[in-house]
A protein has these predicted regions:
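Extracytosolic ligand-binding ectodomains
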Residues: 2-16, 25-424
């Protein structure tokens, strides 16, 4: 079932407002004259929030994506700090509650969501892993709470029935898959093997890479999916090696540290075959004995590198070494806060009904204080964030995005190029 479009959301909100107004009408038989009735502009729909915007974070402190946690938490912390420095939301400071998303095994995320519910959060930032998010999306959105991920890229979220309460600031893997497939072909490779996690994230991205490679005339030497819970990857690595690829796309998480040595042992490691990583396994591997020099990878990045923004993040967390998804986390919080102001209500349903509106088709603004002033003056806004344009399509995902192309020298990577595009 495809999620509600913007028009349907508006209809739902109007219907709900009508029910609220009729329920509050009392038992009087006297109908007021039209001339005595206040106009729509003179009245406000009843609010459901308690006046305090509470935001929870469900981000990785442990698990396969723990390396992404620090920049994401820093983005959330910085946004809330700046919002509160500018007067908060609806006249009160935003409250923050942190939780651990884990990696889905065991089910850490579910119990952590319960803790956030006990904290009475109106919105949750997270999770980072698409597989974790899909495991809790029904629980969160079913409770009338906004779920807003800074890092989910699985294409499946675009058609997920989420009560109009799931959003993200990272572009769908339809874009990353296209960029990665094009990159391999442009690099001169025509017989590419794909090895990917068999989960909500891995399969979707692998399918998009495969489609792009074939569209560009390349052959997919083999398409190998492996269990995310596997203890070893011998059979899958043997299968990939047997296909004799000239390049390998490895769509993985932390298990990359186990797979690379096996690829090397079979003669298809980084020194023998061109390897490509993705956002899930682009990390600092300085503690590993293998050498990744020449390996390339893709990851959603801000439209432009903003050193001033990174400096502000370092003030929040001086230990930061990586800024992946920090801007997207920051923007997720900002958009939620601005949507609450636009709604005049901090409840999840009210925020969800206004999130898309504050990202497009209004007066452009880029700071919370500037955007807040415009909203309080009755203007529609188009928030331009730290990650770039945040314009959302009707599914609650970015309508466009930028994918950074990274390359390893030793076991650390640097950005060598970036490709921006519309998410089709």
């Amino acid at each position: 079932m495809i999620r509600s479009t913007r028009a349907r959301r508006a209809a739902i909100v109007l219907a709900a407002s009508a029910l609220v107004l009729s329920a509050c009408g009392g038992d009087s038989d006297d109908e007021p004259d039209a001339s005595d009735s206040p106009s729509a502009s003179e009245t406000k729909a009843a609010t459901k929030g308690d006046g305090v915007l509470r935001i929870g974070s469900l981000l990785p402190q442990t698990g396969d994506l723990a390396f992404l946690g620090p920049p994401e938490f820093a983005g959330v912390d910085l946004a809330i700090q700046e919002i509160n420095d500018a007067g908060g939301v609806l006249g009160k400071p935003v409250e923050e509650f942190d939780a651990d998303s884990g990696d889905g095994t065991p089910d850490i995320a579910g119990s952590e969501v319960d803790k956030l519910f006990n904290d009475k959060v109106d919105a949750i930032i997270g999770a980072a892993a698409s597989g974790v998010s899909v495991s809790v999306i029904d629980k969160i959105t079913g409770a009338g709470v906004v779920q807003f991920s800074p890092a989910n890229t699985a294409a499946g979220f675009d058609t997920y029935d989420d009560n109009g309460l799931y959003f993200r600031t990272a572009p769908s893997d339809r874009l990353q898959g296209q960029v990665l497939g094009n990159l391999a072909v442009e690099d001169g490779f025509s017989n590419v093997a794909i090895m990917a996690r068999q989960d909500f994230y891995g399969e979707g991205l692998a399918d998009q890479v495969k489609a792009t490679l074939e569209e560009k005339g390349a052959t997919v030497a083999d398409f190998v999916l492996y269990s995310a819970d596997a203890q070893n990857y011998t059979a899958e690595v043997n299968q990939v090696a047997a296909s004799k690829p000239d390049a390998i796309v490895l769509i993985a998480f932390e298990e990359t540290t186990k797979i690379i040595p096996q690829l090397i042992a079979k003669g298809v490691g980084p020194e023998d075959v061109q390897l490509y990583f993705v956002d899930g396994n682009l990390a600092d591997y300085s503690d590993e004995s293998f050498d990744l020099t020449g390996v390339k990878g893709t990851v959603p990045v801000p439209a432009e590198i903003d050193e001033a923004f990174n400096e502000r993040l370092l003030e929040v967390d001086p230990k930061l070494k990586d800024f992946s998804y920090s801007a997207q986390s920051y923007d997720a919080v900002m958009i939620i806060a601005l949507a609450a102001i636009a709604a005049g209500d901090d409840s999840g349903e009210a925020i969800g009904a206004h999130i898309i509106d504050v990202t497009r088709e209004g007066t452009q603004c880029s700071t919370f204080e500037e955007c807040k002033t415009l909203l309080e003056d009755g203007e529609d806004i188009d928030y331009e964030g730290a990650s770039g344009p945040t314009d959302m399509n009707d599914t609650g995902s970015p309508a466009s995005g930028t994918i950074g192309i990274q390359e390893y020298k030793g076991n650390k990577y640097t950005q060598i190029d970036a490709v921006s595009g519309v998410v089709n």
